[in-house]
Design a protein with these regions (language model features):
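Hydrophobic scaffolds flanking metal-cofactor catalytic centers in soluble metalloenzymes
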Residues: 1-136, 140-159, 163-167, 171-182
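Tandem repeat scaffolds
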Residues: 173, 181-277
Length: 277
């Protein structure tokens, strides 16, 4: 028997995937563009600081973002990419004191966010006992992705993120199939389905494939979404009051932040109940 010990869950998941705004140079408030809409009160070009960003890189209206028309800011999650770019890639050198780094820093940020998002999914996949047949491949992909996040700014800019994402996604698909195979009964295949405003109250969606599904404004009150694959599903304004998301696959904090729910909504242990619910 091999003496090699499989990494424990804390070792796998301790990857800095939780946003630490205090260690970031306000990158999401500068690097990314947004347009006046239901999510943002104003237009802002990429690379231009939001007028609410203060000199210390904190938000001047953080406590009032939703009533002031900046709901989108409360939904966004960088998976810890902001502090990685700020403190690791650029070694704590901020774009205000070193304006020559600004353009490159802003371009690297979305690349890093994609890599950190993949780390989130891979770390979760490794916690799934049913996915044990692909754990070795998942672990190798996680280690490769983590190494990529520690590359130089130049290396990150040259990285073919789409190709790497495709490799990882193939493993995530296999993970999903293995995990959902353990759910009894016929599973619903609604990958990429247009379910905007759908009436799915109390629906049995256990083990459903809802990858990339459009669930904007859907009524999911009391729905059973245990072990459903929700990677990339659009849950904006979806009503999850009383829904059971226990064990839902590849659900992220930003998806929950975009949805509606209540104290009765059951969540995976790795995620937090949004303050606005």
């Amino acid at each position: 028997m091999s003496s090699e010990r499989e990494p424990s869950i804390p070792e796998v998941t301790d990857l800095g995937l939780t946003s630490d705004c205090g260690s970031c140079f306000g990158l999401c408030c500068v690097a990314l563009p947004f347009a006046a809409s239901a999510d943002f009160a104003i237009d802002k070009d990429a690379g231009r600081p939001c007028p609410n960003l203060q000199q210390d890189f904190r938000c001047g209206i953080h406590r009032d973002l939703r009533p002031r028309g900046f709901t989108g800011c409360t939904v966004f999650d960088c998976f810890g990419a902001g502090q990685k770019v700020s403190q690791v890639t650029f070694d704590g050198q901020d774009w205000r004191r070193a304006p020559g780094t600004a353009r490159q820093m802003f371009d690297v940020f979305p690349v890093m966010r994609q890599l950190h998002e993949l780390l989130w999914y891979l770390a979760e996949a490794l916690t799934r006992p049913a996915a044990r047949p692909v754990h070795a491949e998942l672990r190798a992909a996680l280690e490769k992705t983590e190494r990529l996040t520690r590359g130089s700014a130049e290396e990150l800019m040259e990285l073919d993120v789409a190709a790497h994402r495709g490799e990882v996604n193939a493993l995530l698909l296999r993970t999903s199939e293995l995990v959902r195979a353990g759910v009894p009964g016929r599973k619903k295949e609604r990958r990429g389905a247009d379910l905007m405003g759908a009436r799915l109250k109390s629906a049995d969606l256990r083990g459903a494939n809802l990858r990339g599904a459009y669930l904007i404004g859907a009524d999911l009150k009391g729905a059973d979404l245990r072990t459903a694959d929700l990677i990339g599903a659009d849950l904006r304004a979806a009503d999850l009051a009383g829904a059971d998301l226990t064990g839902a696959l590849f659900l992220t904090q930003s998806q929950l932040n975009a949805a509606k729910g209540d104290a009765a909504t059951k969540l995976p242990q790795s995620l937090s109940r949004p303050a606005h619910w």
